[in-house]
Amino acid sequence: MKVITLTGYKAHELGIFSHNHRGITYIKKAFEQQILALIEEGVEWFLISGQLGVELWAAEVVIKLKQTHPHIQLAVLTPFLEQESQWQEASRKKYHDILEAADFVDSITKRPYEGPAQLRLKNEYLVQKSDGLLVLYDEDKPGSPSYYLEVAKKRQQQEPYDIRLITPHDLEWIAQEDEMNDSVDIDNL
């Protein structure tokens, strides 16, 4: 595998409405663990569509890891032009910072939003252009990642295609580990 698509829920689907929400830290840690494993397996390119939420947080992880793994690259393939036009200023700034740090940026349809067909095309395109999918997903709460998974599972029936899930259990484990590390009494070591 050389190319992986990173995705998951939009921030509001997770009940995250602040860039300082503690849950973002756990999501980033989970993606960092998986991305490091993928780098060890030979993955060089990480693809996102630039959607608010998990995709941008995962992109921040890739950008951070480029400092120690300069051979990895980030591509942002937006479903349509100016997808950030209706976002809040803080989200637009974060998005533009990621675009500036990305190694490749393009728009799949090369025109502004026209309808949901552009989003379906985005899912198909990113799955087609990658060797696998790393997705934050809860089977009890399908949400937006289910559209990627549907396309990925169809491809998987035709040919080898790697699908890796980060689950709520993974995030709980990271949160518990973090709490244990915070509660260690240094004086008693």
UniProtKB/Swiss-Prot annotation:
Pfam families tied to this protein: YpsA
InterPro entries according to UniProt: YspA
Gene3D superfamilies, per database record: 3.40.50.450
Superkingdom classification of source: Bacteria
PANTHER family in alphabetical order: UPF0398 PROTEIN SPR0331 (PTHR38440:SF1), UPF0398 PROTEIN YPSA (PTHR38440)
Similarity field: Belongs to the UPF0398 family.
NCBIfam families recorded: PRK13660.1
Protein name: UPF0398 protein BH1768
Species the sequence originates in: Halalkalibacterium halodurans (strain ATCC BAA-125 / DSM 18197 / FERM 7344 / JCM 9153 / C-125) (Bacillus halodurans)
